[in-house]
Regions:
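Phosphate/pyrophosphate-binding loops and the adjoining catalytic core of nucleotide-dependent enzymes
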Residues: 1-130
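Conserved catalytic cores of phosphodiester-cleaving nucleases, focusing on short active-site segments
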Residues: 132-134
Length: 134
């Protein structure tokens, strides 16, 4: 099995927002914080990782949701499987993360619907709409 950083290394190099195009990331964990999750089947981690392959090094904020199983329809957001047999997913697309984000911001909303902005940009933006998740 691979470490979380090894999973992130493979995944990040394929992301449109990765600044080191053509280079293999050399990631170092700066911080990893567990956030409370209202989804009993999900752990939410917010990571800061520094990429030493860039000069100067780049810092990335990476929300990750860890699960014991792969939920139906979440294959596109799959990052990898770590040494603890957890399946890692891109938090931006995961209701467990977006709910935890709102909680951290002090914005308690039940079943808040969110989506990731689909336009081309160098980051990932989450848009919160009125109403519950579809």
């Amino acid at each position: 099995m691979r470490s979380t950083l090894e999973c992130l290394t493979d995944w990040m190099s394929r992301q449109r927002w990765y600044a080191g195009k053509g280079r293999t990331p050399q990631l170092v964990e700066v911080s990893c914080v567990d956030w409370p999750s209202s989804d009993a089947d999900a752990r939410v981690q917010v990571m800061l990782v520094r990429d030493l392959a860039s000069n100067p090094p780049s810092l990335y904020h990476v929300p990750v949701v860890l699960r014991q199983t792969i939920p139906r329809g979440s294959g596109a957001t799959f990052i990898g499987r770590d040494e603890n047999n957890d399946y890692l997913f891109d938090g931006a697309y995961e209701p467990a993360y977006t709910s935890a984000l709102l909680h951290q911001l002090g914005l308690e909303r039940e079943n808040q619907r969110s989506r990731v902005h689909a336009g081309e940009q160098s980051n990932t933006s989450i848009i919160f709409d009125d109403g519950p998740e579809p």
